């Protein structure tokens, strides 16, 4: 959530930064309503001051011995009653204006950072580095992961469709075991790196989704329970970040690092026709998420560390990947800066996103009211929040099924996973 004071004091800069994003955003309605609200507030304050003055005068006159029924006192009381009537009309309108302003601001995305490349689409993203060229598979006839998975009997899409609908998968035998091994390996790696594991609720309330920025703008992309004001989580970022909603944290307890494994649920509205086959874009998928709550002065350094934590998984699995600095037009709603990690999928000859690591600055903290206080200092400040995948489990499986695929159709198991599976080949 953007700061209304910042919008008010730097309207041209704010509008320019918003214009660099995809989509159309106009802050003029906010400025107009803000002007009305501030004028109304000033009027109400003046009237309230006069009401307080009248009360004081009346009290002094009565204390001095003047009869309470004196015409002068009665006139003051009549004026006071008139003021109360005015206040009863002004206060609801002021609250209404504040609510309208808040809803308009909630619809605005975060401002891109100065180090985010300017661009309107993913074609203008900037590649930062590549890793693992020496691990690129030499097999020229890679079978797509969904085909080899079904051939090996570890993936079944047809029965998942029967149970649910399209864009679901059933993992069987070694497929389910491989997924579990990946989850355990990812969590172990991140807890060793200093993250504290949490197992959060998979259903969250509206305030939680609003706090992290999915609501109100992206309601159609989430699954909502029909009879409850609860939503299935699209990512563990939502419940983990909101663990601290409405709290004032001690500065000495920052930074806070959490990792969490959860299933995630997304409608994928508007993506029909894209990645309809395989494990890339499902309605339900598993993910290990990394969340940081940090001091504002360290958030960009923490972003680099976060990317390194996600990269550590890919490097341990010896999966070729690249790091992309997203341009302003491809930036997520709540992010000020994002790096995507894209893993190599040889069947398509493309790098595909497997992790998105973002610094949300104070955007989520303002929405969720997460603050911190430094010992011996007055007042509080908003924390900065960060999140990233460490990693998307299904996409990691897809990358293994393709990059470790052998000419005879078997799949070598990455060395770091063999201890979890007790085997070397699928």
UniProtKB/Swiss-Prot annotation:
<dbReference type="InterPro" id="IPR006195">
    <property type="entry name" value="aa-tRNA-synth_II"/>
</dbReference>
<dbReference type="InterPro" id="IPR002314">
    <property type="entry name" value="aa-tRNA-synt_IIb"/>
</dbReference>
<dbReference type="GO" id="GO:0004828">
    <property type="term" value="F:serine-tRNA ligase activity"/>
</dbReference>
<dbReference type="GO" id="GO:0005524">
    <property type="term" value="F:ATP binding"/>
</dbReference>
<dbReference type="InterPro" id="IPR033729">
    <property type="entry name" value="SerRS_core"/>
</dbReference>
<dbReference type="GO" id="GO:0006434">
    <property type="term" value="P:seryl-tRNA aminoacylation"/>
</dbReference>
<keyword id="KW-0436">Ligase</keyword>
<comment type="function">
    <text>Catalyzes the attachment of serine to tRNA(Ser). Is also able to aminoacylate tRNA(Sec) with serine, to form the misacylated tRNA L-seryl-tRNA(Sec), which will be further converted into selenocysteinyl-tRNA(Sec).</text>
</comment>
<dbReference type="InterPro" id="IPR002317">
    <property type="entry name" value="Ser-tRNA-ligase_type_1"/>
</dbReference>
<protein>
    <recommendedName>
        <fullName>Serine--tRNA ligase</fullName>
        <ecNumber>6.1.1.11</ecNumber>
    </recommendedName>
</protein>
<feature type="binding site">
    <location>
        <position position="389"/>
    </location>
    <ligand>
        <name>L-serine</name>
    </ligand>
</feature>
<dbReference type="GO" id="GO:0016260">
    <property type="term" value="P:selenocysteine biosynthetic process"/>
</dbReference>
<comment type="similarity">
    <text>Belongs to the class-II aminoacyl-tRNA synthetase family. Type-1 seryl-tRNA synthetase subfamily.</text>
</comment>
<dbReference type="InterPro" id="IPR042103">
    <property type="entry name" value="SerRS_1_N_sf"/>
</dbReference>
<dbReference type="InterPro" id="IPR045864">
    <property type="entry name" value="aa-tRNA-synth_II/BPL/LPL"/>
</dbReference>
<keyword id="KW-0963">Cytoplasm</keyword>
<dbReference type="InterPro" id="IPR010978">
    <property type="entry name" value="tRNA-bd_arm"/>
</dbReference>
<comment type="subunit">
    <text>Homodimer. The tRNA molecule binds across the dimer.</text>
</comment>
<keyword id="KW-0547">Nucleotide-binding</keyword>
<dbReference type="Pfam" id="PF02403">
    <property type="entry name" value="Seryl_tRNA_N"/>
</dbReference>
<feature type="binding site">
    <location>
        <begin position="353"/>
        <end position="356"/>
    </location>
    <ligand>
        <name>ATP</name>
    </ligand>
</feature>
<keyword id="KW-0067">ATP-binding</keyword>
<feature type="binding site">
    <location>
        <begin position="235"/>
        <end position="237"/>
    </location>
    <ligand>
        <name>L-serine</name>
    </ligand>
</feature>
<dbReference type="InterPro" id="IPR015866">
    <property type="entry name" value="Ser-tRNA-synth_1_N"/>
</dbReference>
<keyword id="KW-0648">Protein biosynthesis</keyword>
<feature type="binding site">
    <location>
        <begin position="266"/>
        <end position="268"/>
    </location>
    <ligand>
        <name>ATP</name>
    </ligand>
</feature>
<dbReference type="GO" id="GO:0005737">
    <property type="term" value="C:cytoplasm"/>
</dbReference>
<keyword id="KW-0030">Aminoacyl-tRNA synthetase</keyword>
<feature type="binding site">
    <location>
        <position position="289"/>
    </location>
    <ligand>
        <name>L-serine</name>
    </ligand>
</feature>
<dbReference type="Pfam" id="PF00587">
    <property type="entry name" value="tRNA-synt_2b"/>
</dbReference>
<comment type="pathway">
    <text>Aminoacyl-tRNA biosynthesis; selenocysteinyl-tRNA(Sec) biosynthesis; L-seryl-tRNA(Sec) from L-serine and tRNA(Sec): step 1/1.</text>
</comment>
């Amino acid at each position: 959530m953007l700061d209304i004071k910042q919008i008010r004091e730097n309207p041209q800069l704010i509008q320019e930064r918003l214009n660099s994003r995809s989509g159309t955003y106009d802050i003029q309605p906010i400025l107009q309503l803000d002007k009305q609200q501030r004028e109304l507030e000033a009027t109400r304050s003046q009237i309230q001051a006069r009401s307080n003055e009248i009360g004081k005068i009346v009290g002094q006159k009565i204390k001095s011995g003047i009869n309470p029924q004196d015409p002068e006192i009665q006139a003051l009381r009549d004026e006071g009653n008139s003021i109360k009537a005015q206040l009863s009309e002004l206060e609801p309108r002021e609250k209404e204006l504040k609510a309208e302003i808040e809803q308009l601001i909630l619809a605005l995305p975060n401002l891109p950072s100065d180090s985010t490349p300017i661009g309107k689409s993913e074609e203008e993203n900037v590649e930062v580095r590549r890793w693992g060229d020496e691990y690129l598979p030499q097999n020229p006839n890679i079978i797509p992961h969904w085909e080899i998975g079904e051939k090996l009997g570890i993936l079944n899409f047809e029965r998942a469709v029967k149970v649910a609908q399209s864009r679901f998968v059933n993992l069987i035998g070694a497929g389910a075991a491989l997924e579990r091994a990946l989850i355990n390996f990812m969590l172990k790696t991140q807890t060793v790196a200093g993250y504290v594991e949490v197992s959060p609720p998979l259903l969250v309330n509206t305030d939680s989704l609003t706090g992290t920025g999915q609501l109100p703008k992206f309601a159609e992309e989430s699954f909502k329970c029909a009879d409850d004001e609860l939503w299935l989580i699209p990512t563990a970022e939502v419940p983990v970040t909101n663990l601290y909603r409405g709290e004032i944290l001690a500065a000495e307890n920052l930074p806070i690092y959490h990792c969490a494994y959860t299933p995630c649920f997304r409608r994928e509205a508007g993506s029909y026709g894209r990645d309809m086959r395989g494990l890339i874009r499902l309605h339900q998928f598993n993910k290990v998420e990394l969340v940081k709550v940090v001091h504002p002065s360290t958030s960009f350094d923490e972003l680099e560390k976060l990317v390194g934590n996600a990269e550590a998984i890919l490097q341990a699995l010896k999966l070729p990947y690249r790091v992309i600095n997203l341009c302003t037009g491809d930036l997520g709603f709540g992010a000020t800066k994002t790096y995507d990690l894209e893993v190599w999928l040889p069947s398509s000859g493309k790098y595909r996103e497997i992790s998105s690591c973002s610094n949300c600055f104070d955007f989520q903290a303002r929405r969720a009211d997460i603050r911190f206080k430094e010992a011996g200092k007055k007042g509080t400040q908003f924390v900065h929040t960060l999140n990233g995948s460490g990693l998307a489990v299904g996409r990691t499986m897809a990358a293994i099924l393709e990059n470790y695929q052998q000419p005879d159709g078997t799949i070598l198991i990455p060395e770091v996973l063999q201890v979890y599976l007790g085997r070397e080949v699928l």
